[in-house]
From Swiss-Prot:
Its main location: cytoplasm. Its EC number is 6.2.1.54. GO terms for biological process: lipoteichoic acid biosynthetic process. Catalyzes the first step in the D-alanylation of lipoteichoic acid (LTA), the activation of D-alanine and its transfer onto the D-alanyl carrier protein (Dcp) DltC. In an ATP-dependent two-step reaction, forms a high energy D-alanyl-AMP intermediate, followed by transfer of the D-alanyl residue as a thiol ester to the phosphopantheinyl prosthetic group of the Dcp. D-alanylation of LTA plays an important role in modulating the properties of the cell wall in Gram-positive bacteria, influencing the net charge of the cell wall. It comes from Streptococcus pneumoniae serotype 4 (strain ATCC BAA-334 / TIGR4). This is D-alanine--D-alanyl carrier protein ligase. Belongs to the ATP-dependent AMP-binding enzyme family. DltA subfamily. Pathway: Cell wall biogenesis; lipoteichoic acid biosynthesis. Keywords: ATP-binding, Cytoplasm, Ligase, Nucleotide-binding. CDD domains: DltA (cd05945). It catalyses: holo-[D-alanyl-carrier protein] + D-alanine + ATP = D-alanyl-[D-alanyl-carrier protein] + AMP + diphosphate. D-alanine binds at D203, V307, K503.
Length: 516
């Protein structure tokens, strides 16, 4: 039976609370919470929130990790007409301060201990939330978040300047959710059993909670204290009865460091959903070897267009013939175009900037009209967004990714995509993972390219010195890479830094190289 679109997220959750009250919605390391619990707890907390007399539709910060109380609080806020701003408990203090400054929330709900002192915003802590649950208040839903009201606001992690709060409405959320639960590429099963690993402050989390709640499934979550410890992570992951794995490719690469991450040990996994960063052929091939029968989905999209706008199931033919995986067929309700530098639409096959339009496009950045005007506009009478990504559309309607416009550099007269360099480096038989980083001179011109490299197991022992490894890598890539793209310096690391969202922190490495 195919999944049907939903008309309202809260009404759908309420429906499952009535029809399957004892079915688990949330599982934290074996501790279960049911749809009945979620309704009762969110109702009771919504009643308490209403009593606070907050300004109508004002945003509320929710601070914490992957606790059940986070989800129940989100639902309570939606019922009581407030957008929520999730902030992960591992966020840097400066970032938390910057978000409060931009968002001006009417309330902070701190599921984890709030790290800032002397905050003027009213606050509710975990004990008070649990006390609200225990009151068992009934709640009549009369003023929920609906239509163009903000459902959630996620702050993107800009490394310079203030973070930008992307406002996602209930209509935006429905556009994404209904595509995901009905699209043939995702082929999402009913009652999905979903890994809930990415933090709620990262919009990849919407890719697990939205379809799961829309289809009456169960979220299996791992506290970040576990995901940050390899031994604990592997021990915990193998015990989870999950069918759908949702993460960045980097997190899957981390899981594949364990030989036990395979279909024999985890026979229940039927789907892998990837978004948030590029899925390489190399990672997908390794995953296909480990899970030969699982469906691997490569999805793409910016936070500003509600999680993702395109997706494709990776085929064996793609893995055998392509150097770079396509990023998907675009959503039917979200016309996606390629434009040139003058803003003209380009024909299929020509490379330019990816522009997305339609009902999933955000209304803009919270309290930031200047940045909103730069990135959001109208295109053919639809709300549209400049992704800042380079792409090409094929005649078959497949979107191809060409890298970030802001990761394009000019070096010795050549225009170079840093991601192209990284992709080519990763083709060396000596390299497990690598990224290319530019070093600038005082005039901000690119002086040279550096490569940060993780070597494959056993490679270092084959060579006496790093310089010999570098020579071997360069020889290995002679026929693959143009000489002007070859980094002049190779730095060997055991690991590469990740952002809090689990992506390789390229901007951080650029800052490190240039001592910013």
């Amino acid at each position: 039976m195919s999944n049907k679109p939903i008309a309202d997220m809260i009404e759908t959750i309420e429906h499952f609370a009535q029809t399957q009250p004892s079915y688990p919605v949330y599982n934290v390391l074996g501790q279960e919470h049911t749809y009945g619990d979620l309704k009762a707890d969110s109702d009771s907390l919504a009643a308490v929130i209403d009593q606070l007399g907050l300004p109508e539709k004002s945003p509320v910060v929710v601070f914490g990790g992957q606790e059940y109380e986070m989800l129940a609080t989100f639902v309570a806020l939606t019922k009581s007409g407030h957008a929520y701003i999730p902030i992960d408990s591992h966020s840097a203090l400066e970032r938390v301060s910057a978000i409060l400054e931009v968002a001006e929330p009417s309330l902070i709900i701190a599921i984890s201990a709030f790290p800032l002192e002397q905050v003027s915003t009213p606050m509710i802590n975990l004990a008070q939330v649990q006390e609200a649950f225990a009151q068992g208040n009934n709640y009549e839903i009369t003023h929920p978040v609906k239509g163009d009201d903000n459902y959630y606001i996620i702050f993107t992690s800009g490394t310079t300047g203030k973070p930008k709060g992307v406002q996602i409405s209930h209509d935006n959320l429905l556009s994404f959710t209904n595509w995901m639960i009905t699209d043939k590429e995702f082929a999402t099963p009913s009652r999905p059993q979903m890994l809930a690993q990415p933090p709620y402050s990262f919009d990849l989390s919407v890719m697990y909670w939205a379809p799961t709640l829309a289809l009456g499934g169960t979220l299996f979550t791992l506290p970040s204290v576990i995901t940050q410890d390899f031994k604990q992570l592997f021990a915990a992951i193998f015990s989870l009865p999950i069918a759908i794995w949702t993460s960045t490719p980097s997190f899957a690469d981390m899981a594949m460091l364990s030989e036990y991450f395979n279909s024999e040990k985890m026979p229940g996994i039927t789907h892998f959903y990837f978004d948030g960063e590029e899925l390489t052929v190399k990672t997908a091939q390794k995953l296909r070897e480990r899970f030969p029968n699982a469906r691997i989905i490569n999805a793409y999209g910016p936070t500003e267009a509600t999680v993702a706008l395109s997706a494709v199931a990776v085929t064996d033919e793609m893995l055998a013939t392509l150097k770079r995986l396509p990023i998907g067929y675009t959503k039917a309700d979200s016309p996606t175009f390629i434009i040139d530098e003058e803003g003209n639409k380009l024909p299929n096959g020509e490379q330019g900037e990816i522009i997305v339009s339609g009902p999933a496009v955000s209304k803009g950045y919270m309290n930031n009209p200047e940045k909103t005007a730069e990135a959001f506009f109208e295109f053919e009478d639809l709300p549209a967004y400049h992704t800042g990504d380079v792409g090409t559309m094929t005649d078959e309607g497949l979107l191809l990714y060409g890298g970030r416009m802001d990761f394009q550099i000019k070096f010795n007269g050549y225009r170079i995509e840093l991601e192209d360099v990284s992709q080519n480096l990763n083709k060396s038989r000596f390299i497990e993972s690598a990224v290319a980083v530019p070093r600038y001179n005082k005039d901000h011109k690119v002086q040279n390219l550096l490569a940060y490299v993780i070597l494959k197991d056993g490679v270092r022992e084959q060579f006496e010195r790093d310089i010999d490894i570098t020579k071997a890598i360069k020889e290995d890539l002679t026929d693959i890479m143009m000489s002007y793209m070859m980094p002049s310096k190779f730095l060997y690391r055991d690991s590469l830094p990740l952002t809090p969202n689990g992506k390789i922190d390229i901007k951080g490495l650029i800052n490190e190289v240039n001592k910013r």
